[in-house]
Structure formats: C-alpha cells, structure tokens
Regions:
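Polysaccharide-binding and catalytic clefts of secreted carbohydrate-active enzymes
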Residues: 1-65, 77-78
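Non-membrane alpha-helical structural segments and their capping/turn regions in soluble enzymes
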Residues: 12-23, 84, 88, 129-137
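Charged helix-capping and loop-helix junction motifs
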Residues: 52-57, 86-92
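Substrate-binding cleft of secreted/luminal carbohydrate-active enzymes
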Residues: 60, 64-84, 94-177
C-alpha cells in the first residue's frame, strides 16, 4: 500500500528531480554559450509552489544559490484587489526573498487580462480587471518602488494590439517613456 511516508518521500524525490533538471539545464546553457541567460517563470502564488503534491520547485533555493538560474519571473497575474494573491503583497513577498546577487527578479504581468469585461473578470475571480485601465501601469510603478525588481515581462505579445486592452497598454507605455 502507498503510505503517507511514501508520499512524502515521493514529494521529496520529485523536488530533487526538478532541482537536478534546472541545475543541468543551467549548466548546459552556460556550457553552450557562457553569456546566455537562463531562467524560469513559475506560478506567482508562493504558497502553492510549496505544496508537496504539485509543482515540486524550490524557487527559494534557485534564487539564493549559484548554478540554478540567472533570473526568475513569477507570473503575478492578479490585481491589487485579488482576494488570495493581491499584486502588492505578492510582489513584495517575491521581492523580499533571499536572492543571490547574480539572480535578477522580473515580474510577469497579465497583459491578457487587461480590458476584461465584468463577466470575464468574474470568470477569472479577479473583478479588478474590469474596474481600471491603469492596473498594469500601477503594477510596474509598485515593482519599481521596491528597488528589487529588475524588469517586467508582459504575457502575451498579442495583447499589445488587442482592442479591449488598448487603454491599459497606452497607460503602461507611459511609464516606459
């Protein structure tokens, strides 16, 4: 029978396997091209990342140690008013994690959620997306205020030209001028 102890061992084993994979990919990238950068873009909810039965990634280890990643880009795809992972608190948690001086923190922003209707925002459990067209801009400004965020990644490129997102994208562009 599959005991609780075996499950814990399986979780530990899966964590070790993912750590080894990340370390080996990093080494392969650096061996192939020394100046290339390698990073990961995990889900933004740190609590979920550390559940023992799903992601199996130790982002704290990867960020604080050498030989794993050059950057990390958590997907913080929520507004400031999200009930589980409000942007400000989630960004702050990531920014305050211990980090090797060579590991950059980029924040993944949800361009694909910009301009959602009220019904669409309700469907993703984040009504804030339907209430403001300055969310992405404010998220960048908050990240900058931490002095710990090195940049931003917008998902996805297609949303730069999506009509419903036009106001959000125009406001976002203002902070990059």
């Amino acid at each position: 029978s599959f005991s609780c102890m075996q499950f814990q061992d399986l979780g530990r084993s899966n964590h070790q396997n993912v750590d080894l994979l990340i370390k080996k990919v990093y080494k392969t990238v650096k061996t192939t091209r020394k100046k290339a950068v390698f990073g990961v873009s995990p889900a933004g909810n740190l609590d979920n990342l550390y559940l023992n039965n799903s992601y199996y990634c130790d982002v704290k280890k990867w960020m604080s140690s050498t030989g794993y990643i050059d950057y990390i880009c958590p997907q913080i795809y929520w507004t400031f008013t999200h009930t589980v992972c409000p942007y400000k608190a989630t960004c702050k948690r990531w920014a305050n994690l211990k980090r090797n001086k060579n590991v950059k923190l980029y924040i993944g922003l949800a361009g694909y959620r910009a301009g959602l209707s009220k019904a669409q925002a309700k469907a993703v459990y984040d009504i804030g997306w339907s209430k403001s067209n300055t969310i992405l801009k404010r998220e960048v400004l908050y990240g900058r205020s931490t002095k710990k965020v090195s940049g931003y990644v917008l998902f996805s490129y297609a949303d730069l030209n999506r009509k419903a997102a036009a106001k959000d994208i125009a406001n976002l562009k203002k902070v990059f001028k």
